[in-house]
């Protein structure tokens, strides 16, 4: 049986009966937490994997829909911004070392926000965009996010986040590279993020991501692990953190543990130790005094989900609208429908890619332009938002400038230049 036939077999089984409300509508909020890899699905997955070789790139392999999350990677990135109070609190701290610890706390706190079951976000198509906003932040503050898939092979997702009243911005790119490792698969998370605190004279924090592993593909129970090293660095204040996300050994060890240090970048003197579990309680210990306290307890964490414009106001290539039929199938656990709708989107993109190749047309992002010599300190991003955002400006000026990039809040209209390539648009109003 070929790979396509094995995937088609997934269409024969669907279990939507138990997840519909009285009106017949699917309940989408909890289906990502349902582990659907039963014995039949596991056998199908095993048949697919049997055709792979260790180290093989998985980016061109069509995975069965039962392991897909009901959101695009462009939306998944917003997990970083769903505990905004921690970032706001960090921005109010006078002491540079304590402020660094606050930013580290905010970043580490976000990793537990994920489906309970093993789920992979939908791969964004080239040119796909996602925008959202938060209008219920503390003290009536607001935040905005926009992202775009700037490359498909390899996949690259650029994003921009701004909290105008706090004068905080985050620029970043996520570059996942999937590999098959035998009983595991790995998403090697390349890319990085830059957090800029305008209140502190544009103090910048640079950070990367741990890698993501799915264990138990061939035998054992499937589960997700974060692994390897993550760093946070602030060159201005000469501080850095190196955090190891420990993976469980075959015999010894525990799941989800972290261990790391905060140190002085110049002297290499270790100042604090970090320990605990990234999805439970994390601790920080002052090496000089020996005092140990809770850095963050995820078990009491409250998240603020992003808000989006109504679907009828969205462009066809905005994530929620583009993947709506696929997400509907996933919500009902109707994998025949989900596979069919997902294939429609992907086939359309292949046709467009072929047409661009035949016509000699190069793709250019709408929101992000290539980094140039004037973009100090963000060379690793490759692309940045094309508009200039000076955090010293009034919050309302920053907000209105952002709204000229793309509609983000309900009621906004598309500008006539929306479809122009970013490099052809003016960086200021």
Curated annotation (Swiss-Prot):
Entry-linked Gene3D superfamilies? 1.10.287.2720, 2.40.160.120, 3.30.70.3490
Give any single GO term for biological process. single-species biofilm formation on inanimate substrate
Q: Which UniProt keywords apply?
A: Lipid transport, Lipid-binding, Transport
Q: Which domain of life is it from?
A: Eukaryota
Q: Name one GO molecular function term.
A: lipid binding
* InterPro entries given in the database record: OSBP_sf, Oxysterol-bd, Oxysterol-bd_CS
Q: Which SUPFAM superfamilies match?
A: Oxysterol-binding protein-like
Any coiled-coil regions, as ranges: none
| Family from the record | Belongs to the OSBP family.
Q: Any extra detail in the entry?
A: The C.albicans mating-type-like (MTL) locus contains, in addition to the genes for the regulatory proteins (MTLA1, MTLA2, MTLALPHA1 and MTLALPHA2), a and alpha idiomorphs of a phosphatidylinositol kinase (PIKA and PIKALPHA), a poly(A) polymerase (PAPA and PAPALPHA) and an oxysterol binding protein-like protein (OBPA and OBPALPHA). OBPALPHA is not represented in the genomic sequence of strain SC5314 because that haploid assembly includes the mating type a allele of this locus.
UniProt protein name: Oxysterol-binding protein-like protein OBPalpha
The scientific name of the source species is: Candida albicans (strain SC5314 / ATCC MYA-2876) (Yeast)
Which gene is annotated as encoding this protein in its UniProt record? Answer: OBPALPHA
């Amino acid at each position: 049986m070929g790979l396509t036939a094995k995937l088609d077999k997934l269409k024969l089984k669907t279990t939507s009966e138990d997840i519909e409300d009285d009106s017949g509508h699917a309940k989408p909020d909890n289906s990502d937490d349902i582990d659907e890899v039963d014995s039949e699905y596991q056998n199908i997955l095993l048949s697919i994997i049997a055709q792979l070789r260790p180290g093989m790139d998985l980016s061109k392999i069509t995975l069965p829909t039962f392991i897909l999350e009901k959101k695009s990677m462009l939306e998944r990135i917003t997990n970083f911004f769903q505990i905004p109070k921690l970032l706001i609190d960090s921005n109010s701290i006078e002491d540079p070392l304590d402020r660094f610890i606050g930013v580290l706390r905010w970043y580490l706190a976000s990793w537990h926000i994920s489906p309970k079951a093993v789920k992979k976000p939908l791969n964004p198509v080239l040119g796909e965009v996602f925008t959202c906003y938060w209008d219920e932040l503390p003290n009536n503050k607001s935040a905005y996010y926009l992202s775009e898939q700037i490359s498909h092979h390899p996949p690259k997702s650029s994003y921009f986040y701004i909290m105008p009243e706090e004068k905080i911005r985050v620029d970043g790119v996520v570059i996942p590279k999937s590999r098959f490792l035998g009983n595991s698969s790995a998403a090697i998370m390349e890319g990085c993020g830059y957090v800029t605190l305008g209140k502190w004279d544009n103090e910048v924090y640079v950070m990367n991501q741990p890698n993501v592993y799915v264990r138990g593909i061939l035998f054992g129970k499937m589960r997700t692990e974060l692994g390897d090293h993550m760093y946070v660095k602030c060159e201005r204040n000469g501080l850095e953190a190196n955090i190891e996300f420990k993976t469980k050994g075959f015999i010894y060890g525990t799941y989800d543990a972290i261990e790391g240090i905060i140190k002085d970048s110049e002297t290499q003197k270790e100042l604090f130790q970090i320990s605990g579990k990234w999805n439970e309680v994390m601790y920080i210990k002052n090496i000089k005094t020996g005092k140990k306290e809770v850095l963050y307890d995820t078990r009491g964490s409250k998240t603020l989900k992003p808000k989006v414009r109504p679907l009828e106001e969205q462009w066809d290539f905005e994530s929620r609208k583009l993947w709506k039929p696929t997400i509907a199938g996933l919500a009902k656990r109707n994998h025949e429908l989900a596979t069919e709708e997902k294939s429609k989107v992907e086939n359309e993109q292949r046709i467009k890619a072929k047409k661009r190749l035949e016509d000699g047309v190069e793709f250019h992002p709408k929101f992000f332009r290539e980094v140039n010599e004037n973009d100090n300190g963000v060379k690793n991003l490759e692309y940045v938002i094309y508009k200039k955002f000076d955090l010293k400006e009034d919050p309302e000026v920053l907000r209105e400038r952002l709204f000229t990039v793309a509609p983000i809040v309900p009621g906004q209209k598309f500008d006539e230049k929306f479809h122009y390539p970013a490099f052809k648009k003016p960086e200021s109003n």
